[in-house]
Amino acid sequence: QCRSENRQPLFTNKSSLRLQIMVDVTDKPQIVEHVNKSLSMTVYETKWIPSSARFVLLGSPARQTGMLQIYQLNAGSIELEAEVERPKSFKCGTFGATSLAERRMATGDFVGTLAMWDLERLKETMVVKAHDTIINCIDGCGGLKGAGAPEVVTGSRDGCVHVWDPRQQDRPVASMQPQAGEAVRDCWSVAFGDAHSTASRLVAAGYDNGDVKVLDLVAGKMRWETNVSNGVCGVEFDRKDIEMNKLVVTTLESRYRLYDMRTEHPVHGFSFLSQEAHQSTVWAARHLPQNRDVFMTTGGNGSLELWRYSYPQARKIKEKDGHEKGVLGTVELLQKKNFSTQPVASFDWNVDKEGLAVMGCLDQTVRVIVCTKLHKL
């Protein structure tokens, strides 16, 4: 069982204490590797089990099956607690649509299957053929975070984005899909946002051709769309359970964009800044749960970069045409560190322990890292 009272102290041995002392010599945040474990599978997703010191790995061993593993963080090591294998490889997962009491995980695999998992029994409670081909990305809302009903959104190579209610399994409750005769674009990333009340919820989706689309689930129509010129590897709102504030879009060609989503100009749309990062593909951005203005980006060169956003004195100005336009602040690179020669495919902050995170690289490793001094930012 995944109970918070069973958690072990994160740092108990002398070597870990010495490590903490070594990085305390400056006030600058440091990225410290706490645990590094080689695996016999390629890891596509890493997720902390809510309110525990356990995490889930999703991936595929050499025989191309799907593997779900549960690890326990115990002092200076991680221990495999349970695993289950399925015929097809897993690609993505989320706890976003579950309650803290149930802690059920939604997963997507390489053949388009969406499943909800009871991790205590390692059994599926829901299995749906959600897409015709691989589910690249998934997110959840209405469970741990966000007002309203629990929902899961999936994006696929078939060009479709589907929103699912786990209580209604026969069909999606909302969809974005290519029109007849329209080119099918590969959806690489999805994220919920603006879920601050039962009358407000959005889904953002990024595609391989640079399209970013935001669907208003309450109104049932497109809220906004743009193109960022490069394939969109990741999209994430700084918080999914507040009025939409900032949206980070990570792309190929070593760049990400940060949009201010509070003010939309009728001609220019939402204002944004463009930032170079990693000297490689920027796979994802993950905002710190304890501070929404701090976020980590993951690189195709095996690196992590820690950023902080600072707001401008005024977030909007009035243009000569009378319309308001958003004003961007600045981003600051706080720290960076290289861990591998292969991409960092997944990264997840721990909600309960500030600075603790788990990450998976395509070199068949999982790492637990600690970012220090975040409380001083």
Q: Where does each model-flagged region fall?
A:
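Leucine-biased recognition of intrinsically disordered, low-complexity hydrophobic segments
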Residues: L10, L17-L19
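Acidic Ser/Thr/Pro-rich low-complexity disordered segments
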Residues: Q313-L328
